[in-house]
Amino acid sequence: MIEQGLRQEINLVTTEAKNRRLEFITVEHLLIALLNIDEVLTFLRGKRINIDELRDELEQYIDSHTPVFPEDVDPDIVPSIGFQRILQRSVYQAHSAQKESVNAMNVFVSIFSEKESHAVSMLKLNNISRLDVMEGISSQLADT
C-alpha cells in the first residue's frame, strides 16, 4: 500500500538507524526519508528551503535526543509511536480517498499531526505548514 520509492527510503533510514544502534526510528527519521523523494524535494525547493540545512538539523536532533543501545546488546529498533501514527494515518487517509497507495506527500501532510515533534517545529521554523503541503499536492495533481 506504500509506494515503492517511499518504502525504500523508509527502509534506508531504518537500516541507518539500526547501524547507529538507535533504539527508535522517529518522526525526524521519516522526514529525512521524505527529503530523498523527488516530489517532496520539488515542493520544498519551490518554497526556497535549504534542504541540506534542514537535513543537518534533523540529524543533529536525532544524534542528541535518540537513545542508543549499549555495545553488548543486539539492537532491535522500534518505530516511535509518532512514526507509527503517521504511517497509519497516511494509510487510512489514502484508503478513505479510495487511493491504491500512499505516497510521500501524503506522509508529509500526516507529519503535521505530530505537533510535539521536532520535525514539525523545524518545518514551522522554515514557514512550511500543513496547508502549504496540501496546496502543493493540489498543484502537483493539477500539473499531471
What is the role of each PLM region?
Residues 1-144:
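Histone-fold recognition with a strong bias for associated Lys/Arg-rich disordered tails
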